[in-house]
Amino acid sequence: MKTVCGVFMVLLALTVLLAYLPGNTVEAGSCSNKNCVSSCQGSGNSSGKCINSKCKCYPRG
């Protein structure tokens, strides 16, 4: 019983750490609208949007 409780506490602590530390979310690897718009505008496009975790740039004109 002591071992089961210890394992449960360790798993709980790891879950809390992963949930509240920055940079550990699934979205960290994907694009965000702010990054996408500035990246697209920097490459000469008029705008951009994050679709399915990928940047979609819209050309000028």
UniProtKB/Swiss-Prot annotation:
Domain of life: Eukaryota
Disulfide pairings: C31-C50, C36-C55, C40-C57
Molecular-function annotations in GO: ion channel inhibitor activity; toxin activity
GO cellular component terms, A-Z: extracellular region
Signal peptide boundaries: 1-19
A matching Pfam family: Toxin_2
Keyword annotations from UniProtKB, A to Z: Disulfide bond, Ion channel impairing toxin, Neurotoxin, Secreted, Signal, Toxin
Compartmental location: Secreted
SUPFAM superfamilies: Scorpion toxin-like
Expression by tissue: Expressed by the venom gland.
Family: Belongs to the short scorpion toxin superfamily.
Protein name: Putative neurotoxin-A
Upper lineage: Eukaryota, Metazoa, Ecdysozoa, Arthropoda, Chelicerata
